[in-house]
Amino acid sequence: MKRTILVMALVFLFAGCLLFIQPQDGFCADPIIVGVPTSLYTPFGSYGLKAVNLAVEEINAKGGVNVGGQKRPMKVVVSDTRGGEPGVPVHDALMAYEKLLTEQKPHAIVIGAFRSEVLIAAMDLVAKYKVPQLGTIAQTPGFQAQFRKDPVKYKYLFRATTDALIDAGYIAHTLDMLKKDFGLDKILHIYQDTAWAKGFAGMLQKHCKETGWTEVGYEAYADGASDFSPALSKAKEGKAQVIGMVWDVPLGAGVFAKQYVAMKVPALLVGFIPPMGSPIAPKAVGPDVEYSMTVEFPVGATLALAKLPKTGEFLDKFKKKYGELPEPPAVNSSAYDSVFVLASAIERAGSLDPDKLVEALEKTDYAGVSGRIKFNQDHIMVFGEKSADETGVCVVFQWQKDKDGVLKRVPVYPEFLAEGKIMLPPWMKK
């Protein structure tokens, strides 16, 4: 009996080796360890991890990654940093980050920190351990500012997604359309008191002042906030026509969405509030999501675009594997793309040596779900608003009812991706 079990075990072991066999010695190839230190409390982290696992599964199904003539599988290792949970100190998140680096010894990192404050603090850790990182969540422009202080030290760090200034730029240009086409010119800003949201809201405020908007309010709330009624009341009393909102913590965003609906605030909601932009928003929030506008960064995070087939292909595969679409309208496609960018760099480097891998990553030119992926001198992905063949791109969509009365997300900006025009609610029409 024992001999039978031993023989069967050897058979299964041999079968598992066949795909990743090293031609010169006949042994199973060691896996490429891909580390994911992020906050799994947030949907950005949990759905991003699903996207990474999907990409790794696809790559391994095709034989793995060619490393200097050897086909090697990818293996994902995860550390929940809890960095996105309100009240969790940056230090605690860093300890989880470092534990993954020292114990799991990844060859590279994808996704990375959720909270921008954790990203900035973790840059020194990544540099210390010389592990190439493709960050795909944290949005603070402080990343490139820190990078410029010592490009040699921080050369292992890359941002393979947008930052707050890119996101805000798309919303700013949407506000320009609202002002030009409908004469709207009164706005109240609400933002989460965190690094990335400050950058987003600050740019939006500056743009509005420069383009003639009247500011009804500029309201900051702690990331653990659970009552937004003072700001919403201010919007009503000040007759704001638009609320520019930026938030990412699940609890607060959900509370805001419900209070906005319950208080019947007569202002158009524009910005980034995940529950309002999620594919399941009509069920989770209700029919009052109609007319709200969200920037999805980058494209392909949750919404399939008719003019960018790769977005639909990724989301179809995601839904087939997990039985649902990703929920947060941001960065899921970046997480997916990052694995392929990493695999391509490894193959071009012909090595897992971190310095050679950095050189290969710097030369990245990859056509991904999120658009064309190239990095600039600050190791951040280049974005634009004109063509996914030239740069990474985002999209602004609005919830509208189709001819059957069903709420759909309609791309309205940029023009080359638009599938409809912005619609004002009846109570705003003059």
What is each residue range found by the language model?
Residues 318-332, 343-410:
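Segments of small-molecule ligand-sensing domains
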Residues 29-32, 51-78, 211-212:
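Signal peptide-proximal N-terminal region
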Residues 164, 257-336, 347, 409-419, ...:
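Extracellular/periplasmic periplasmic-binding protein-like sensory domains
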Residues 35-53, 79-86, 90, 115, ...:
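Extracytoplasmic "Venus flytrap"
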Residues 106-218, 268-294:
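Extracytoplasmic ligand/sensor domains, especially the bilobed periplasmic-binding protein
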Residues 1-33, 101-102, 128, 427-430:
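Short, low-complexity disordered leader/linker segments with a strong preference
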Residues 44-50, 65-148, 160, 221-228, ...:
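Beta-alpha junction/loop-to-helix N-cap segments that form part of ligand/metal-binding clefts
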Residues 44, 48-55, 89-97, 118-122, ...:
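Stable alpha-helical elements in mature extracytoplasmic
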